[in-house]
């Protein structure tokens, strides 16, 4: 797998990549499975390869059941800790991140960074109830890097609006009726944001999202806000999505020389769309002002310096030339950030647009999904590329012998080829919806759609899969928590807005 990664320039993963393993710690042996992890080759260089590890049974290690180990430099050594400690001041969810000494098959690898994965244990460690954790599917984004000319990404697949929604811990979710309902709710909300049906503040928790964006700007982390690095927790109490911090890589942060390192959010399309929301922008601004006050008291910078000193001493035992971060830059950074008004931010954000996309050997050109729980279904096609496409045919295929058993019969007649307009780069996707009724013995078949770029002979085959629909209407009344509390005078909200407390 590692050799394959060096051939194509990135590491691709599959569930079948896991191999059995045993973890020994303090005279205990724990059964596990593990695989290589990471996207870029920096995770595979030298002897300190990155691994994703899942412990079996009820076993945990450092309170975690799923985690990764990697060379500390892939996360900027202790920079991740400085980032997380800052976010904790704003009650933004963070994974555990520690340093451990690792032996692999008897070979001393030295110090490795251990990073918690996205499970209910992460939520419980952040004093949150178990809930759904979502992300955008990034598989086509990485496939486009393999297929792209000169190993470059294809701009067509760097669009969060066309990506499918993915979920962590999928088996456990579908086995739980409560979690399944939460999944439908959370996915419907996030799809509503993707398609601009709902405002960002209706989908995301304004306070935690605004604070997250402010801290990312404060630390200069552009990496944590890339759409494919975003992770969202569906809070079943507030029924909103909250960001989970991940992979800040502040060692690669933009500096503030001539202001070029500021407003990293506005170089990410999704963050421009989120910051346009007045409620989230208000919380973003409030968090920046809080950071300024924290810095003016000097205790916060001293706190970060004490953390840095502790970890530089530890890491310096192996990495002798490791330097600290320029924490004195932070006061200058926060002052410059506060100089920008909301109008300035929106104006600057409009300047960042993707480059051109030429016709290439795309990894895919459409997404096709099936929604609906009854006998009547909706087959939806989404154009992923900035070129018009034709759907040549839709067929019912026998699952056992892959032969066509009967023609696809929509509720309204179709005339092939079906036309699907181009999707503008970073724009809302071009779609086509077809209603149809399930045929007799529908469990014995699968749908197969064949499509092509107009003027191109290459045929792309696509098997539609079941998906959760976008909410057509708001799933709950848009009321502020203060308005709701007026209906229940015996309750009050905790200062951190995370608990309801009975008044005495």
Predicted regions and their residues:
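Phosphate/dinucleotide-binding and metal-coordinating scaffold of catalytic cores
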Residues: 1-504
